[in-house]
C-alpha cells in the first residue's frame, strides 16, 4: 500500500472532525484546526513568535481551563472536562462541538478595547483595535472564566456549565459571560474614542 492511498482520518478525542467553517476572515489564520488525536503539544510553540497560532484551538481551551486556581497544572483534568463538555454540546445541539466552539470564539472576541496613554503626567484612555491573536486569547479566557465562576458553589458539574457557556456564546446570547464581557469592553472603548 502506498502512502498516497493511505488516508488517516484523525479526529479530536477520536470523535470530532476538524473540518469546520471559520466565518471571520481576520481570525482564520490564528485558529488552528490541525487534526490531532491528543491535544497536547507540550509547549513546543513557546519560543517562537506567534507560535501559539499553530496550537490546536481545543488545546488552547484546555490550557485556559488550567489557569491559576484549583486546577492549575492539572492538564488531564482539564482534558476530561473539555472532552465531556464536547459530548454535552453534541447532545444538546446535534452539531460538531468544534464548530460550535469556533462560532463561540468568533462571537465573543472583542474588536476594540481601551489602552492607557500618558501625556505630561495625565493619563488618557484611548480606544484601539484588538489584534486577531489577542481577540482569540480574550475570547477563550472569558469562556473559561465564565464557566469556572458559574460552576463554583453550584451543584452542576463544570463540564455542563462549560458546555452551556460555549453554546450561549455560539448563539450570541447575552447570558454568556464571554458575550457580556465583550459588550462591556466594546462599550468602554466606544465611550473613550
From Swiss-Prot:
PROSITE patterns under this entry? Answer: RIBOSOMAL_S7 (PS00052)
* Family, as annotated: Belongs to the universal ribosomal protein uS7 family.
Assembly, in brief, is: Part of the 30S ribosomal subunit.
State what changing residue 14 to S does: In strain: MT-4
GO biological process terms on file = ribosomal small subunit assembly; translation
Give me the gene this protein comes from. Answer: rps7
Q: What is the lineage of its organism?
A: Archaea, Thermoproteota, Thermoprotei, Sulfolobales, Sulfolobaceae
Keywords for the protein's UniProt record, in alphabetical order: Ribonucleoprotein, Ribosomal protein, RNA-binding, rRNA-binding
Q: What protein name is recorded for this chain?
A: Small ribosomal subunit protein uS7
What results from changing residue 131 to A?
Answer: In strain: MT-4
Mind telling me which residue stretches traverse the membrane in this protein? none
Cellular-component GO terms for this entry: cytosolic small ribosomal subunit; ribosome
Q: What does this protein do?
A: One of the primary rRNA binding proteins, it binds directly to 16S rRNA where it nucleates assembly of the head domain of the 30S subunit. Is located at the subunit interface close to the decoding center.
One of the Pfam families matching this protein, by short name:
Ribosomal_S7
Q: What is the effect of changing residue 150 to S?
A: In strain: MT-4
Provide a Gene Ontology MF annotation, just one: mRNA binding
In terms of CDD domains, this protein maps to: uS7_Eukaryote
Amino acid at each position: 500500500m502506498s502512502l498516497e492511498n493511505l488516508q488517516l482520518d484523525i479526529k479530536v478525542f477520536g470523535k470530532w472532525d476538524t473540518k469546520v467553517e471559520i466565518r471571520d476572515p481576520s481570525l482564520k489564520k490564528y485558529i488552528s484546526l490541525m487534526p490531532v488525536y491528543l491535544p497536547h503539544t507540550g509547549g513546543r510553540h513557546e519560543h517562537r513568535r506567534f507560535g501559539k497560532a499553530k496550537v490546536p484551538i481545543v488545546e488552547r481551551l484546555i490550557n485556559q481551563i488550567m489557569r491559576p486556581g484549583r486546577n492549575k497544572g492539572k492538564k488531564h483534568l482539564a482534558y476530561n472536562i473539555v472532552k465531556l463538555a464536547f459530548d454535552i454540546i453534541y447532545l444538546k445541539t446535534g452539531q460538531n462541538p468544534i464548530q460550535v466552539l469556533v462560532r463561540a470564539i468568533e462571537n465573543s472576541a472583542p474588536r476594540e478595547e481601551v489602552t492607557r496613554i500618558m501625556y505630561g503626567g495625565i493619563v488618557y484612555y484611548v480606544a484601539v483595535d484588538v489584534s486577531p491573536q489577542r481577540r482569540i486569547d480574550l475570547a477563550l479566557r472569558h469562556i473559561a472564566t465564565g464557566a469556572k465562576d458559574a460552576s463554583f458553589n453550584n451543584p452542576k458539574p463544570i463540564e455542563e456549565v462549560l458546555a452551556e457557556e460555549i453554546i450561549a456564546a455560539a448563539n450570541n446570547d447575552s447570558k454568556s459571560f464571554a458575550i457580556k464581557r465583550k459588550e462591556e469592553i466594546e462599550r468602554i472603548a466606544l465611550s473613550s474614542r
